[in-house]
Each structure stands twice: as C-alpha cells, then as structure tokens.
Amino acid sequence: MNLWDKKAKTYARYQNTLNTIQKQTFEYLQNLNISFQNKSIIDIGCGTGVWTLHLAKEAKEILALDSANAMLEILQEDAKKLNLNNIKCENLSFETWMQNNPNTKFDLAFLSMSPALQNEKDYTNFLNLAKIKIYLGWADYRKSDFLDPIFKYFNTEFKGFYKKDLENYLLEKNIFFHKIVFDETRKVQRTKEEAI
C-alpha cells in the first residue's frame, strides 16, 4: 500500500458546494473562456475526485488517473451517488500511464495539487497531452504550527515540493502561460496519534 492509499481514509472528499479555491479557479478559467463542456479530459493525480466530479458534470468523458487505488475507490463511490457515468478510472502513476499511452490526446489536461509531475520528461508529456492544460500547484510556503518551531530550532525551512517546478520549466522553454496566485487558509487539527 502506498502513502496515498493510506491518506485516502482522511483525504478531502467531493462536496457539491465549491470551496473557496474551486470558486476562484472556475471564475478565473471562465474569464479565460475555458469551457469543460463536452470535452475529453484527463485529471492527473485525481485523488478522491474533489475536482474530477465537478469537471465530469460538464465533460463528455474524463479519465481519472491516480496511483492510489483507495483514492479511486472513493471517487467511484461518489460518482455512483451522483449518477455520473462518464468517468473512467485508471490506477497508475502518470509516468507508467504515459509509457502505456504515448500517443493519447485529450481536449484538456488537468492536474491539481498532485506530485505526479516529477521531472522535465513529465512536464513535456503533460504539455503534449492536450491543447488546454490546467495545473494547480502549491505556490510555496505552507504554515504549520507544529512544524514551524521544529524548522526554526534546526535553522531550516520547509523546502516545498516543487523548487524545480513546472513554472520554471515553462520560463526556461519560453512557453507562454497564465498564472494567478490564490490565497487559502486551512486549519487542520490532529491528535498526537494522527500526527505520529
């Protein structure tokens, strides 16, 4: 069982009401005239379907790709409750899926808060999947009342997941992109047992 399978039990699930980031994202995409209506979409690192299920309400078809089977089981359970039957789930890493499907194309490639893109090959594959690409990632700093004192004590900082990230790759390759930074605050409290 991989780490993400373990996280599935407590991972955020689909909510019919859009959260703050989803509202801001869909408004921003609408201002860019990006539509999901009748599109073929791949959602890379889809997790439990927090975004997938909203996209599926408009999409012609959507491929939900994730390396954690437990996440996909939750997505399928919620899709069934919503009577959405245009979602196909595949339990593979992005790298393996690309090796198996090197020539597959979609109208839109979507990736949200997923560590699926690890290197330049992944970035290139993502960019070649579709005409429209949407990538939502962590900007950088994440505050933690638990971790911040530890970082301070050891005179270090949170390194982030993407110090060499897609944005730098796009800049290096002189590829045009739109960028917006959303500000979100989440408060998560865990028991001592959950934190360990």
Predicted regions and their residues:
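Substrate-binding/catalytic lobe of Class I Rossmann-like enzymes that use SAM or dcSAM, i.e.
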Residues: 160-196
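Conserved Class I S-adenosyl-L-methionine
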Residues: 149-164
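Conserved beta-strand signature within the Rossmann-like core of class I S-adenosyl-L-methionine
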Residues: 131-142
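Class I SAM-dependent methyltransferase SAM/SAH-binding core
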Residues: 50-85, 90-96
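Short conserved loop adjoining the S-adenosyl-L-methionine
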Residues: 96-103
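Conserved class I S-adenosyl-L-methionine
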Residues: 1-35, 38-47
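A short, conserved alpha-helix within the catalytic core of class I
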Residues: 116-129
